[in-house]
From Swiss-Prot:
Active site per database record: H55, N128
Name of the coding gene: kat
Keywords for the protein's UniProt record, in alphabetical order: Cytoplasm, Heme, Hydrogen peroxide, Iron, Metal-binding, Oxidoreductase, Peroxidase
Originating species: Listeria seeligeri
Pfam families: Catalase, Catalase-rel
Lineage of producing organism: Bacteria, Bacillati, Bacillota, Bacilli, Bacillales
Protein name per UniProt: Catalase
InterPro entries on file: Catalase (IPR018028), Catalase_AS (IPR024708), Catalase_clade1/3 (IPR024711), Catalase_core (IPR011614), Catalase_haem_BS (IPR002226), Catalase_immune_responsive (IPR010582), Catalase_sf (IPR020835)
Protein family per UniProt: Belongs to the catalase family.
């Protein structure tokens, strides 16, 4: 027989009655001196933190990553040096635009983030299922998200808003061809691919730098829903993707993804009709071959969703030695924004939470702030200092010097915008069924959208491929010919 556990306050004091408040007699008011009541209500009032401004709706799981092929010729990152190296990971999948309890059937990119707890500290992979993004410069990030979020006056998402933005942002066209395919409504988190979206730099022991993009390929295959299938699921279930992931892991059907790397030598950066460091551009596999890196297996569900899935924080700038960010303009903005939002949302010491803490020692002079529950104790909280017992900088970890491309500063327009070339490639690579789904999904989404906005988008589609625009126009009853005379 086990000892009976006492219900207690947060001060550890046993509670004798958790059913009735203290009152002044049977019919009198509740007493302010009822510490149990006040503590319980006050804590309940503060149970939630601000939800993520994007990627609020998510599901996570623990697992492992096993390196299957040494990457030492590209990077000196320790966890990628030897075949068979195992690294603990936590992965979080998410929808992007809508709130924490929104349906998982909605058309939306899916976030695909993985925290690697490596022997050199944490490494964050922060990507999406779709390989490109809407914009090429972080200065437009608040605007694209505002356009996709609900109207601040009605609190209802309005196609007039985001299609207006898309029509005036031709660089978004490639993302549209992915998002409005059936890949914009995945069947489950277990059956989505993942992409770094941005290029990064890998540096090996000799100091040689290459640009890379990373891709996750699900062993279960990529499975999507049609708009009609998504609607049928949504009528019955808001949580189908979270439920599927949780139940698969509980039943021992552990989802797996293979990680691949694509490599670009910096000397070849200018050999294309687009900028490979532009987040609106894909690196197609037949041009940039995939090389297998390793396999991720998710094998344990969180014990506490709030403490783990909700409190985990990612930043694409959290890199280990042998990795650096590229000059991608969207990535450069994310390097600041992602940790900044976690400090606002969770608190300045969010990295001390177990889900965010590295497995390696943390030894520095960053102290105090709200809730510093892993406070360092040395009286020497400055550097440099003359004490041999204190942590010292290690020149072996100085980032290697990198060539800077450019000799002037200013608000310069990106080179080689090529806004429609990659969308054309995507259209060409789609099957007849995929093209039909893309057209149908756009036509359906345009219900209630102003005609002038539709026409501007059709002009963009026409510059991708006339057939693309013609089929969308036919579905909406617009006479395309009179609106594209100047484009012929």
């Amino acid at each position: 027989m086990t000892d009976r556990r006492n219900l207690t306050t947060n001060q550890g004091v046993p509670i004798g009655d958790n059913q009735n408040s203290m009152t002044a007699g049977l019919k009198g008011p509740t007493l302010l001196e009822d510490y149990v009541l006040i503590e319980k209500l006050a804590h309940f009032d503060r149970e939630r933190v601000p939800e993520r401004v994007v990627h609020a709706r998510g599901a996570g799981a623990h697992g492992k990553f096993v390196t299957k092929k040494s990457m030492k010729k590209y990077t000196k990152a320790q966890f990628l040096q030897e075949e068979g190296t195992e690294t603990e990971v936590f992965a979080r999948f998410s929808t992007v635009i809508h709130g924490q309890h929104s349906p998982e059937t909605l058309r939306d990119p899916r976030g695909f983030s993985v925290k690697f707890y490596t022997e050199e500290g944490n490494y964050d992979f922060v990507g999406n299922n779709l390989p490109v993004f809407f914009i090429r410069d972080a200065i437009k990030f608040p605007d694209v998200i505002h356009s996709l979020k609900p109207d601040p006056r009605t609190n209802i998402q309005d196609g007039n808003r985001y299609w207006d933005f898309f029509s005036l942002t031709p660089e978004a066209t490639t993302m549209i061809t992915y998002l409005f395919s059936d890949e914009g409504t995945p069947a489950s988190y277990r059956e989505i691919r993942g992409s770094s979206v941005h290029a990064f730099k890998w540096i090996n022991e000799e100091g040689k730098t290459v640009y890379v993009k990373l891709r996750w390929v699900p062993k279960a295959g990529i499975v999507n829903l049609s708009t009609d299938q998504a609607a049928q699921i949504q009528a019955k279930e808001f949580n189908h993707a979270s439920r599927d992931l949780y139940e698969a892991i509980e039943n021992g059907d552990y989802p797996e993804w293979d990680l691949y790397v694509q490599v670009l030598d910096p000397k070849d950066l200018d050999n294309y009709d687009f900028n490979p460091l532009d987040a609106t551009k894909d690196w197609f596999e037949d041009v940039f071959p995939y090389e297998h890196v390793g396999t991720m297996t998710l094998n344990r569900n969180p014990d506490n969703i709030f403490a783990e899935t909700e409190s985990v924080g990612f930043n694409p700038g959290v890199l280990v030695p042998g990795m650096l960010p590229s000059e991608d303009r969207v990535l450069q903005g994310r390097l600041f924004s992602y940790s900044d939002t976690q400090r606002h949302r969770v608190g300045p010491n969010y990295l001390q939470l177990p889900i965010n803490s590295p497995k390696t020692p943390v030894d520095n002079n960053q102290r105090d702030g709200q809730m510093p529950f892993k406070q360092q104790t040395s009286s020497i909280n400055y550097e440099p200092n003359s004490y041999d017992t204190e942590p010292k900088e290690n020149p072996a970890y100085i980032e290697p010097e990198q060539e800077i491309r450019g000799d002037i500063s200013g608000r310069l327009v990106a080179e080689k915008p090529n806004n429609f070339g990659h969308a054309k490639e995507v259209w060409k690579r789609y099957s007849d069924a995929e093209r039909a789904a893309l057209v149908k999904n756009i036509v359906d989404d345009w219900e209630g959208v102003r005609e002038d906005i539709k026409i501007r988008n059709l002009r963009n589609f026409y510059q991708v491929e006339p057939e693309f625009a013609e089929r969308v126009a036919a579905g909406t009853g617009i006479n395309l010919a009179e609106h594209v005379i100047d484009l012929k």
